[in-house]
């Protein structure tokens, strides 16, 4: 019964978080892929093209990808933790669950990013072939290894100490997002077919960090606090 609860509760929590934070994700994607635009110009550009709906242009693939990704990672992480396999720990369990999930979610992320950029994925697919589905996966793999080894394991560690899901999830998201930001930047640009090298100034690779934090911190806080709330409710029945 517990395994079904892990999947269901994490899926519900992720859908809620994704719907709330999707506009910021669209904003971030456009900002990282338009290096000549300021945040204000980028925001105006999205709105002028499609109005408010432009920020929700990739709703279906975004919700599908994030829901499957988070619920699968959470379920697998819990599964490996409960099995208590030898020679494993929280970080290894997180990495394994993240890599297994990313093989399916990366193609959906590709579709999402093209939609967020107001571009036709099908036209790009005809030009580039089916390899387009996994373009940028090397960056996605690196991002997955880092994020999966940190988010759930770090959250569990912090929550054992603070015993406050809001504080634990907030600190986890800030630390993890800041560390993996350069890979997120490279992944977003690689998927869209843009140049990766932006000079030796590390600041270029942290473009969009504030937007990423604005998206991921509330997303992870909403997800983990909702899971915690639903888990407690489930135990009452």
Swiss-Prot record:
PROSITE patterns: SOLCAR. A motif (Substrate recognition) lies at residues 191-196. Disulfide bonds: none annotated. Pfam families: Mito_carr. Transports dATP and to a lesser extent dTTP, TTP, UTP and ADP, possibly across the mitochondrial inner membrane. Belongs to the mitochondrial carrier (TC 2.A.29) family. This is Mitochondrial carrier-like protein L276.
